[in-house]
């Protein structure tokens, strides 16, 4: 009997490892390094996607990316959703002067621009998406009015939350 219980617990532990399962994240959200993430397969313009993330969960925003590890996690998360299109992230140039800012207000120090980016093609690209052609690992500035899938990021709400 003890062997059976041990085996059952081992199977559960192994099935949850690497999935990002976290009791403090909403169902359907994935956890990594203290944050909750979710890919939304809904077409929205950049500003509408940001507003959606803010309304979806307290403290939510389009995803900010601060390390290669986080970028790899997000690429895998998007890949699991079988998305073959570019995906919005929370980086934009609100003043349209090439000064990039994360929508959550966090510091902008890590970059992963694709070759030749940002290029402000046709002087109309002030929002940033993960490029599908790079396996969602590299960034491209894009027209903010384009409708794309997107990734939201939030901190876990903690014990006793309404999540």
Curated annotation (Swiss-Prot):
Domain C-type lectin positions: 32-153
Binding-site residues for Ca(2+), renumbered to this chain: 125, 141
SUPFAM superfamilies in the record: C-type lectin-like
Location of the motif Mannose-binding: 117-119
Expression by tissue: Expressed by the venom gland.
One matching Pfam family: Lectin_C
Coiled-coil annotated residue ranges, if any: none
Keywords: Calcium, Disulfide bond, Lectin, Metal-binding, Secreted, Signal
Disulfide bonds: 25-36, 53-152, 127-144
Record's subcellular location: Secreted
GO cellular component: extracellular region
InterPro entries found in the cross-reference section: C-type_lectin-like, C-type_lectin-like/link_sf, C-type_lectin/snaclec_domain, C-type_lectin_CS, CTDL_fold
Molecular-function GO terms, alphabetical: carbohydrate binding; metal ion binding
Protein purpose: Mannose-binding lectin which recognizes specific carbohydrate structures and agglutinates a variety of animal cells by binding to cell-surface glycoproteins and glycolipids. May be a calcium-dependent lectin.
Recorded family membership: Belongs to the true venom lectin family.
UniProt protein name: C-type lectin lectoxin-Lio1
Organism: Erythrolamprus poecilogyrus (Water snake)
